[in-house]
């Protein structure tokens, strides 16, 4: 009992303890800030390309390509543009809806269309519709409500590399399929390299590469402005908690002109982690030393995976946690569906959650596989019958374990608050 009391005291002290943060959420990848330092030019270019939707709606289908490396502000800029453009359209009495689709998460044409429908609050029948039928439902929905739809296809290069040519053709040349006089569907294609489109047929490529907007990597000075905007204007930290030299240090690590990657996402992630390290050490200031420790822990290759994990709902996270638990207990990499479900039930009950039924757990695993978080293979010799074996597709580490635990805790807190 004494040990339990000591642990409880430890947890309570940590909860009550001081923190350098004020609004840490403004440092997360999903946050859309009020300002976008050093992306004003790109916002203007997007606005010029799409202004005909407002001046002459339905006359043309706009297509824009955005190209730039990871962390150069492509996603946040397009989302901010979509938010502002829709507001301005509304003020002019026009209905413009902006949808943002991540092709790495919605990995097939059908899944992408279902997600577009979800963002439109359009119910898709459960019966097995084809992609073409689903798109027709979406278009009819737009037609009835006189809506202009901007579809951003983020990580479009992934879709190009993994999808059948006919799916790509259908998507980008939709008006060859639809007998529609009024053009209601417009595209923003986001990719890392324009060269990823080199393999496309010329007839498709000509439809995609209409207007190209480049997003160059950030310089040290630009990263400094971005970090300071989150610290000062967005109030990520308590006033005076982050030393100016710390911000300079992080900016110099990642600035393209200083030999870094120019990746703002990693710069923000490093700043957030430095703040957490300061909290752990009981420091009221975020110092260069904290930034150095944070930098040593940041793994650029995990950045995309971490984004995917942060998008999971509670019970999807519990399935991932179950696989990690089995790995720790048994030392194996692959586990049967039955074992994973059994461990998931234990994890859920331990947290006071009602485990989902078998069909729902199977659906979670199917979605996790589509997202690239787990892999599945058929059992070989030595097992009775054909059994599906499941494994995490990412390396299991202490950092990953901490992330999963933190995300589970956050989902439980959100449920409690609602």
Swiss-Prot record:
InterPro entries: AAA_22, Cdc6_C, Cdc6_lid, ORC1/CDC6, Orc1/Cdc6_arc, P-loop_NTPase, WH-like_DNA-bd_sf, WH_DNA-bd_sf
UniProt-recorded Gene Ontology molecular function terms: ATP binding; ATP hydrolysis activity
The entry's keywords: ATP-binding, DNA replication, Nucleotide-binding
Protein's UniProt keywords contain ATP-binding: yes
Chain positions recorded as ATP binding sites: 72-76, 218, 230
One of the GO BP terms on file: DNA replication
A Pfam family per the record: Cdc6_lid
Function per UniProt: Involved in regulation of DNA replication.
NCBIfam families, A to Z: orc1/cdc6 family replication initiation protein, PRK00411.1-1
Family designation: Belongs to the CDC6/cdc18 family.
Protein name per its UniProtKB record: ORC1-type DNA replication protein 2
